[in-house]
Amino acid sequence: MNEIKLSQFEGADDRERFAAALSYMRERPGMTLFVEPGEYVITTPLARETMNNAITGKFGTNPEDVMFKPDFRYDRGLDFSGHISSRIIADGVTLMIDGFMEPVSVRDCSGVEIVGLTIDHVRKPYTKGRIISWTTLDRDENTAEILVDFPENFPINPDIIYPRYCTYVPDKERFGKDFGIRSFTYIDDHRARFVLERSDKSFVGNELYLWHSFHSRPAILIENAKDTVLRDVTIHSQPGMGIVGQKAENILIERLRVIPSVGDHISTNTDATHFASCRGLLRLDGCEFEGQGDDSINVHTYYYTVISHEGERCRLQIKAPTGTHAQSLDYPEIGDKLELTDKKTLLSVGEYRVVDCRPDFEGFFCDVVLDRALPDDLDDYFIADPDELPVLEFVNCRARNHYARSILIKCRSALIENCTVSDVFECAVKIAAEAWWHEGISTADVTVRRCRFINCGRRLTECGGVYVRMDCEDSTTKAHGLVTIECPEAHHGIVVKNTKQAIVRRNHIVSAKQNCCIEPGVEVL
């Protein structure tokens, strides 16, 4: 019998019952777990302590500085490590997470499929209130004082932190314009006064949201996993990203929804999905994104820094500002092709093969043997691993009202098709390697077609539609390969830079500024 039910397993709480079922399945590849519909509370003392410490400022005014570190202690909810061909059917099932943790870990496994699961939090990783009064303080300084009422399920405290905040405008069904908070005065658990900067009109009736974290653990981690499938999964909240994929191969995600729960307007505190150093096919089909604090999707590998080398031997380390997004070691595989990359232009200037690789998980570096010697002076170069990039298919998806860009592409091959993006703060699609973040690499063949981009680029950005560029020191570099853009409705323009070849056709563009800008030197086919 290859089918079991969660109700067959006992435990002191819901987390222990899931652990018992998953332990049973770990020893029996090919099992299917049916979870009866309902709410299941997943919690631990550490998760609750972490949440309280973060919200009350014990981790500082930005908890990411403490929580987004390799040595930070955290608990997991459902752990699929060691599983082979396991399925969990969880239609109508909600995991109510009490605290800050990693709710689902799909790691060191193969063939795991999750269907129908919803993830939410007992106490959201943000606080919501309603602005009930507005008083102008100084018209010249553009300051005002607001009184905010917080409901029973969002109590505040005198030490509450808010590394990010925003308003939601019900009449427009989107986040409001940027402003600053100069001071916070606690009245009681459900009322507070704030003095605002850059505030030129009344916000009365708007919702005020206070984030309590940026990056920490994701709602779902997919790491060192092969052939993972997520279907009809919903993520309503997480004190970090929704899904993080790291060193995973072949990921299929269908009808994912990273959206706020009913009555709220924030979903994940940062990226909805983020995939780093993955392989094979990465396909997202029919997914929906709304209210997250960063991109809908970001796909990239990392630029390694050579910290020492002699002949064909080298020691590589990722020196991204915040480390890897799983806070675990990234390293090339034996047989991978590596590219020597100019830091200023992000152009590949040489190719090598990995003969041997020995990762040091404690030191967070890897010792690599190449098929030939590296140049003597490597201060001006990165090492990139293009084999640690998937082919991306992002199709039939919708995204609206969220921060940052929506679709961020740093992989060699990608198809963005039949997608609608509206009311995002920056551009709908950005195709760009980013040297400062140590995230790459340049693309070879990216197609954006049959998409609609409406009212994007709400912040002062160069482009709100499709933005092709390289974020590096040399602004004249031509590192991208072929980019094809065919969209029937691309409000707010198309900008193509740093690209060898471009096909831009059959686009209907309505822009407040320049409709389409293709810099000199780009071959238009």
Spans of model-derived segments:
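Right-handed parallel beta-helix/beta-solenoid
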Residues: 1-18
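Extracellular parallel beta-helix/beta-solenoid repeat domains
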Residues: 14-15, 19-36, 40-525
